[in-house]
Swiss-Prot record:
GO terms for molecular function: 1-acylglycerophosphocholine O-acyltransferase activity; 1-acylglycerophosphoethanolamine O-acyltransferase activity; 1-acylglycerophosphoserine O-acyltransferase activity; calcium ion binding; lysophosphatidylethanolamine acyltransferase activity; lysophospholipid acyltransferase activity; plasmalogen synthase activity. CDD domains: EFh (cd00051), LPLAT_LPCAT1-like (cd07991). This is Lysophospholipid acyltransferase LPEAT2. Belongs to the 1-acyl-sn-glycerol-3-phosphate acyltransferase family. Optimum pH is 9.0. It catalyses: a 1-acyl-sn-glycero-3-phosphoethanolamine + an acyl-CoA = a 1,2-diacyl-sn-glycero-3-phosphoethanolamine + CoA; a 1-acyl-sn-glycero-3-phosphocholine + an acyl-CoA = a 1,2-diacyl-sn-glycero-3-phosphocholine + CoA; a 1-acyl-sn-glycero-3-phospho-L-serine + an acyl-CoA = a 1,2-diacyl-sn-glycero-3-phospho-L-serine + CoA. Possesses acyl-CoA-dependent lysophospholipid acyltransferase activity with a subset of lysophospholipids as substrates. Exhibits strong acylation activity on lysophosphatidylethanolamine (LPE), and lower activity on lysophosphatidylcholine (LPC) and lysophosphatidylserine (LPS). Exhibits acylation activity on both LPE and LPC. Has a preference for 18:1-LPE over 16:0-LPE as acceptor. Palmitoyl-CoA (16:0-CoA) is a better acyl donor than oleoyl-CoA (18:1-CoA). Among several different acyl-CoA species the best acyl donor is eicosanoyl-CoA (20:0-CoA). Activity is calcium-independent. It comes from Arabidopsis thaliana (Mouse-ear cress).
Length: 539
């Protein structure tokens, strides 16, 4: 060993033939890649020629495999104190019951007075496309004062504020994280903004009338036309200083405040300056978030607290650069980063669609419903799978009878897809089982299905499969033709097994399989395209 000296490195560099990875950090005005890895890291599972095609049952569609992602370990919709626990909380609840009755009376009286004032302000007002006249806005001050009384009745005797709201002409759009139903009440009192809300809110008793006075922009989250119209209205009202400022909750639903989920882009497409606002609910014994807890239960718990803490922080206005004005995604990322940093929480790819999956799993009485969330924003970005399609995939997965941990084993998987054990069906399962543990999760099932579904050759292959099965060319596949077509991929099929597969592929259940039937079924069960693989590799 050489004698040590002060100038020699402690760890000697060893030469390597492997290329170094150069990481370039992009600032806000650079391209959208964020991090550029040069040279690109090559996945050893991709492009392995004939060996890959042999192992991959979908090699005739693509040489790639679905991305490997870890399990979703966080539930952003979980209320951490759904019930009364501990002696302190029980004693406090009993002591506060008389206070709760007084608060309930104050709540009802404030709601009634605010509702009547709003009805008066709206009486005879027909021109809803223009800003509300000033004298009507002055009447709405009665409703705003009533909303402060409502906050008081819920235990928010004082609310800590940090920073100040920017003037409307500086930041016409305000965005905030969304934890409870309390924030809209607070913002109505504090800012009296125009909000963007779901169409379903219009039918709520009392509340629907009040938000109509805010010249609410309604949106149906499942309608692309409705979303486009909402963006147009946001642009129109943000560009006119006579309208109130606009308030949006870009998460699209409430969370527990422990993470920040993906943002919808409606607030960022217009390209106007945005003021982010952060809301916190510091607590020890009572989580005030509106997650997996009913509204009535949450209201009762609020009524029976001595005081509920709430903090509102107005962050500096975000002025979009010229590139960000043209790129809503970058502006959204910059805003969400500012809010997440202030909250000191991580950002996830969950979205409202994950809440739909969670509610669906709860309705189906599945154990641990949070196992079925998949971070749908990433799924939609990678595979363009909609929330409704994801719920249909969940129905298929549930038919495989997952265990308490949300996992499905081979025999249950095969039964759910009407397959029998054979080399091909096992390779299909192994294609999904990226962890190689002998069981699959819903997230893995969805990613594999979405990966196959979005391959450029998928539709063409489905059409070729129909032509191959329709031996007599009459436009329909008979049960005999199906059995003949499958005998090479799934050998030794008996009549009952062929009949089960035929029933699955007959989408409209009219006892014959048309091309539309097959295409529709394979869109809902894209993994089944592998059983039509022989002689279908398009050139």
């Amino acid at each position: 060993m050489a004698d040590p000296d002060l100038s020699s490195p402690l760890i000697h560099h060893q030469s390597s033939d492997q290329p170094e990875v150069v990481i370039s950090i992009a600032d806000d005005d650079d391209d959208e890649s964020g991090l550029n890895l040069l040279p690109a890291v090559v996945d050893p599972r991709v492009s392995r020629g004939f060996e890959f095609d042999h192992l991959n049952p979908y090699g005739f569609l693509s040489e790639s495999e679905p991305p490997v992602l870890g399990p979703t370990t966080v539930d952003p919709f979980r209320n951490n104190t759904p019930g009364v626990s501990g002696l302190y909380e029980a004693i406090k609840l009993v002591i506060c019951l008389p206070i709760a009755l007084i608060r309930l009376v104050l709540f009802a009286a404030s709601l009634a007075v605010g509702y009547l004032a709003t009805k008066l302000a709206l009486a005879g007002w027909k021109d809803k496309e223009n800003p509300m006249p000033l004298w009507r806005c002055r009447i709405m001050w009665i409703t705003r004062i009533c909303t402060r009384c409502i906050l008081f009745s819920f235990g928010y005797q004082w609310i800590r504020r940090k920073g100040k709201p920017a003037r409307r002409e500086i930041a016409p759009i305000v965005v905030s994280n969304h934890v409870s139903y309390i924030e809209p009440i607070f913002y109505f009192y504090e800012l009296s903004p125009t909000i963007v809300a779901s169409e379903s809110h219009d039918s709520l008793p009392f509340v629907g009338t009040i938000i109509r006075a805010m010249q609410v922009i309604y949106v149906n989250r499942f309608s692309q036309t409705s979303r486009k119209n909402a963006v147009h209205e946001i642009k129109r009202k943000a560009s006119c200083d006579r309208f109130p400022r606009l308030l949006l909750f870009p998460e699209g639903t409430t969370t527990n405040g422990k993470v920040l989920i993906s943002f919808q882009l409606g607030a960022f497409i217009p390209g106007y300056p945005i003021q982010p606002v952060v809301v916190r609910y510091p607590h020890v014994h009572f989580d005030q978030s509106w997650g997996n807890i009913s509204l009535l239960t949450l209201m009762f718990r609020m009524f029976t607290q001595f005081h509920n803490f709430m903090e509102v922080e107005y962050l500096p206005v975000i002025y979009p650069s010229e590139k960000q004005k043209q790129n809503a995604v970058r502006l959204s990322q910059k805003t969400s980063h500012a809010i997440a940093t202030s909250l000191n929480v991580v950002q996830t790819s969950h979205s409202f669609a994950d809440l739909m999956l969670l509610n669906k799993a709860t309705e189906l009485k599945l154990e641990n419903p949070s196992n079925y969330m998949v971070e749908m924003a990433r799924v939609e970005s990678l595979f363009h799978v909609s929330s409704l399609e994801a719920t249909r995939f969940l129905d298929t997965f549930v038919s495989m009878i997952p265990d308490s941990s949300g996992r499905v084993r081979l025999h249950d998987f095969l039964r759910g897809l009407k397959l029998k054990p054979c080399p091909l069906s096992k390779r299909i399962f192994e294609f999904i089982d990226v962890e190689k543990v002998g069981s699959i999760t819903f997230k893995q099932f969805l990613f594999a299905s979405g990966h196959v579904l979005t391959q450029p050759l998928f539709k063409q292959t489905c059409e070729l499969a129909f032509s191959h099965c329709d031996a007599d060319g009459d436009g329909y596949i008979t049960i005999q033709e199906l059995g003949e077509a499958l005998k090479n991929t799934i050998p030794n099929l008996n009549k009952d097994e062929i009949r089960g597969m035929y029933h699955l592929l007959d989408d409209d259940q009219d006892q014959r399989i048309s091309q539309n039937d097959l295409l529709s079924c394979l869109r809902r069960n894209p993994l089944l395209i592998a059983i039509f693989a022989p002689d279908l590799a398009p050139t």
